[in-house]
A protein has these predicted regions:
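Conserved SAM/SAH cofactor-binding pocket of Class I
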Residues: 59-135, 143-144, 150-151
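SAM-dependent Rossmann-like transferase core, predominantly class I methyltransferases
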Residues: 15-87, 224-229
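Conserved Class I SAM-dependent methyltransferase catalytic core
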Residues: 173-219
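N-terminal lobe of the biotin/lipoate ligase/transferase fold
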Residues: 211-309
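Short loop/edge segments at beta-strand edges and connector loops
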Residues: 124-126, 246, 324-326
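Catalytic beta-strand/loop module used to bind and position nucleotide/cofactor moieties
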Residues: 84, 142-148, 260-262, 267-270, ...
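Mobile active-site "lid"/loop adjacent to the S-adenosyl-L-methionine
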Residues: 144-174
C-alpha cells in the first residue's frame, strides 16, 4: 500500500477495511518496556497493527551509538511506536517522525508525551512512496528500519501493518529513498538504515555505493537465516567536489599539491606519464578513470600500508563486482582491469592513493586487459569516479562523525575477496616454489605454506599467480 492512509475509505477497498477492523479488534494495545541504555528504559503503549520494539529496534539503537555528533535534526521514517524517536529525543535531538500507519503516528505522539519529550518529537503521517512526500531539508540524520518482509503477505497482516512492514514490490524502499536523497541533494545528511540483504537483495547497500555514497557498518546481528546490519551512508566529503584537470603528467604528482585538510582528491581526463608500482609505466587511454586521493598520514596509525592497500582493493572490488589479485590488481575474468598505488610522504604528513581503471578492453605488449564496459556497462569516467570515491571514502573519509570500521573487519573482507581468485584453481608461486595461500596477516601480507615451510609474503616481486 504505497499511498497514505489519511482517508481510509479512499485508500482501502471494502475487503481491506473489513480485514483491518477484524485484525485490530482481535487484539488490545500492549505495554512494552524498551531499554534505551544500561540505566534507563521507556514505557511504550503499542496498539494493534503498530510495529513494537524488537531485536532489530535494539540493534538500530545500538548502531546509532556509532554516530558521534552533537544532537541536531533527526528524521525517522517508519517510526512505529516511537521507540527510536523518543530515545534520540531524550539525548537532545529534535525529531520529525513519519509513518504510513496513522495508529503509529498516534502511538508515537502519546508515547512521546509520556516520556516528556513531546516538545522535541513531531509525528506526521507519510513516508517514502507517498505522493508529494519529501525529506525535511534540514535533516542532519535520517534513520529507517527498512521494511523487510516479502510483499506476498496478503491476508496475513492487517493492511496498515502490511504497509509498514512489507517491502516495495518493484525496486525496494532503499532505492526509493536513495532517489529522494539524490534528487533533493542531501549532501550533508547521514542516512542510517537497518538492512536485511540476505533474503532481500533489493536492499543491497551496494546500490548506494554505485550512486556515489560511502557506507560504513555500525552494527550487525544474525537472526535466524538473516543478517541484519545497521549501515551509515553519506556523500564523500559531504559532497565536496574533486579537483579536475583536462590533462596532467601524473595525478599522483598533482596530489602532492592538494590542501592538507578535508576529503581531497584529483582526477584527470588524460594522464601522460602515469606510473604504477616501483615506477612502472601505467598506460591509459582517453575515457579511462584516473584519479588520486590525498589522506592524512595519521590514518596509517589505524591501518598498516599493506592492509590499507588490500582493504582499498577489497572495497573497490565489492563495489564493482570484480576480483582482486594481491596486492593491488583489479581483475575481471582473469584479465587486469585496473590497479591501485600507494605512496606516502613523511615530510608533508600525507598518503596518496592512485587508482586507474580501463574503460574498454584492449591489448598492450601482448597482454590483454579488461574494461568496465564489460562488467558495469556504458558509464563515463565521472560516474566511475563517484563509485571509486565512495568505495575509498568508506574506509578513509573522516568528514562524517562516524566510527571507523575495525581493522579486523577489513582484514576479513580483504581475505574473502582474495579467496575469490584463489578458489578458482590458480597456481601461486613464491621464490620459484608452488605455495598454498592460507591467510592474510594484519599487516596485509600473505600467509603461505610449501611442504612444511611457512612463509609470510610481503613483497610481490618474488610472488606470482598464474590463471
Amino acid at each position: 500500500m504505497n499511498k497514505g492512509l489519511r482517508n481510509l475509505g479512499e485508500k482501502m477497498g471494502t475487503s481491506e477495511i473489513s480485514r483491518e477492523v477484524e485484525y485490530s479488534s482481535s487484539e488490545h494495545s500492549k505495554v512494552h518496556d524498551f531499554k534505551i541504555n544500561d540505566m534507563n528504559s521507556i514505557k511504550l503503549i503499542v496498539p494493534p497493527t503498530v510495529y513494537p520494539p524488537r531485536r532489530d529496534t535494539k540493534l538500530l539503537l545500538k548502531g546509532l551509538e556509532g554516530i558521534n555528533m552533537q544532537p541536531g535534526n533527526l528524521v525517522e521514517i517508519g517510526c512505529g511506536s516511537g521507540a527510536i524517536s523518543i530515545a534520540k529525543a531524550l539525548e537532545g535531538w529534535n525529531v520529525t517522525a513519519f509513518d504510513v500507519n496513522p495508529l503509529a503516528v498516534v502511538a508515537t505522539k502519546g508515547n512521546s508525551e509520556v516520556a516528556g519529550v513531546n516538545d522535541r518529537v513531531t509525528a506526521e503521517e507519510g513516508g517514502v512512496g507517498e505522493e508529494n512526500w519529501k525529506l525535511p531539508a534540514n535533516a542532519d540524520l535520517v534513520v529507517w528500519n527498512l521494511p523487510y518482509l516479502s510483499p506476498d503477505l496478503e491476508n496475513i497482516l492487517g493492511p496498515m501493518e502490511e504497509a509498514a512492514l512489507t517491502d516495495e514490490r518493484l525496486r525496494g524502499w532503499s532505492e526509493q529513498l536513495l532517489d529522494l536523497a539524490n534528487e533533493e541533494s542531501q549532501n550533508g545528511t547521514i542516512f542510517v538504515l537497518l538492512m536485511n540483504s540476505d533474503s532481500n537483495p533489493k536492499n543491497s547497500p551496494l546500490t548506494w555505493v554505485r550512486k556515489g555514497w560511502s557506507k560504513r557498518s555500525l552494527a550487525v546481528e544474525r537472526v535466524g537465516d538473516d543478517t541484519l546490519e545497521v549501515i551509515a551512508f553519506w556523500r564523500p566529503g559531504f559532497g565536496s567536489e574533486p579537483t579536475y584537470l583536462e590533462k596532467t603528467n601524473s595525478t599522483m604528482d598533482e596530489a602532492r599539491n592538494l590542501p592538507k585538510f578535508g576529503w581531497q582528491r584529483i582526477r584527470s581526463a588524460e594522464q601522460i606519464s602515469g606510473r604504477g608500482r616501483k615506477g612502472a609505466i601505467w598506460h591509459s587511454n582517453q575515457g579511462d578513470m584516473i584519479a588520486s586521493w590525498s589522506v592524512k598520514l595519521e590514518e596509517l596509525n589505524r591501518l598498516t600500508p599493506g592492509l590499507l592497500q588490500v582493504s582499498i582493493g577489497a572495497s573497490i572490488c565489492e563495489a564493482l563486482g570484480v576480483q582482486m589479485k594481491w596486492p593491488n590488481d583489479l581483475i575481471w575474468q582473469g584479465r587486469k582491469c585496473g590497479g591501485i598505488l600507494l605512496e606516502s610522504s613523511t615530510y608533508d604528513g600525507t598518503i596518496r592513493i592512485g587508482v586507474g581503471l580501463n574503460k574498454k578492453a584492449g591489448e598492450i605488449e601482448g597482454f590483454s586487459y579488461s574494461g568496465w564496459t564489460e562488467y558495469i556497462g556504458e558509464i563515463d569516467s565521472n560516474e566511475m569516479f563517484q563509485i571509486i570515491d565512495a568505495a575509498i571514502g568508506s574506509i578513509l573519509d573522516s568528514t562524517p562523525p562516524i566510527d571507523s570500521t575495525e581493522n579486523t573487519i577489513w582484514q576479513q573482507k580483504s581475505w574473502a575477496k582474495l579467496c575469490e581468485i584463489l578458489s578458482t584453481g590458480v597456481v601461486a608461486k613464491f621464490d620459484g616454489r608452488a605455495v598454498n595461500i592460507v591467510g592474510l596477516s594484519g599487516a596485509g601480507s600473505l600467509r603461505a605454506y610449501s611442504d612444511s615451510t611457512a612463509y609470510e609474503i610481503s613483497d610481490v616481486d618474488d610472488f606470482s599467480i598464474t590463471f
